[in-house]
């Protein structure tokens, strides 16, 4: 069976171990109008953002400081590779566990 990938959105797991002061990220391609939903918990508060790049510019529609958990969604305003990113505290390694999923524009 061939397909265009327009099946029901599936949860993708987040399972990261991030060294003290370092970053970890999970990236995915989104089309304009796609909605990315995520849910995570971290072993300690960490800085978290959702970002993408336009040339050399980093665009951060979501930028949260010192969060240990988050559940939210964001609809992409442009087609691009988008990344969920966590920054571990300078003095502490962390683990981040959770999931993400993409709902295509129009719910497909």
Features from the language model and the residues they span:
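Acidic, Ser/Thr/Pro
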Residues: 1-108
């Amino acid at each position: 069976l061939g397909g265009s990938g327009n099946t029901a959105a599936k949860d993708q797991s987040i399972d990261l171990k991030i060294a003290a002061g370092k970053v970890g990220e999970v990236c995915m391609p989104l089309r304009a109008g796609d909605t990315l939903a995520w849910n995570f918990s971290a072993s300690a508060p960490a800085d978290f953002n959702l970002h993408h790049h336009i040339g050399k510019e980093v665009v951060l529609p979501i930028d949260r400081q010192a969060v240990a958990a988050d559940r939210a969604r964001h609809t992409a305003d442009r087609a691009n590779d988008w990344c969920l990113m966590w920054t571990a505290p300078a003095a502490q390694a962390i683990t981040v566990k959770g999931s993400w999923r993409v709902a295509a524009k129009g719910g497909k």
